[in-house]
């Protein structure tokens, strides 16, 4: 399917959700492998829930960051994905997003890396160092906004540009 899109001149971007994983209780696959490493934790040992889904991965830990980057490289090299849209990019550090872009750029200088510049709750990422910052400082990582999306596609009661409502 990806080849068919490429043959038609269409790039393929993959929607990725690295901000959290399934399993919000003790005993998740990652916690079973390396307890207390894969997720951001509160002082009492409970999961930080910046994703709004029960947990938030700790991309500030080197091997977690490597896991994310290696998996993205796999999708680009083995499946010829052209870019990635990150769910809740605000739950990932800006330096993580910049490193992701830098590594993927080495594979394809036309790579698209962008995401939602917000979180789903109070994140464990240090204020001012979120992936949202990476999407605003001209380093190749993009961010988008619901207001722009809504202006283009419209919302309930408002048609948007694609439906002839904006001049």
Predicted regions and their residues:
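Short N-terminal helix/helix-N-cap motif within the alpha/beta-hydrolase-1
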Residues: 21-22, 94
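Glycine- and acidic
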Residues: 57, 81-86
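Aromatic- and acidic-residue-enriched carbohydrate-binding clefts of CAZyme catalytic domains
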Residues: 1-8, 22-66, 70-78
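Conserved structured core elements
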Residues: 11, 62-69, 82, 90-98
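Conserved beta-strand edge residues that scaffold enzyme active sites
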Residues: 18-20, 90
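Active-site-proximal helices and loops of the catalytic beta/alpha 8
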Residues: 6-8, 88-167
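Short, well-ordered coil/turn segments that N-cap beta-strands
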Residues: 8-10, 15, 80-82, 108-111
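Conserved, mostly hydrophobic/aromatic
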Residues: 5, 15, 75, 86, ...
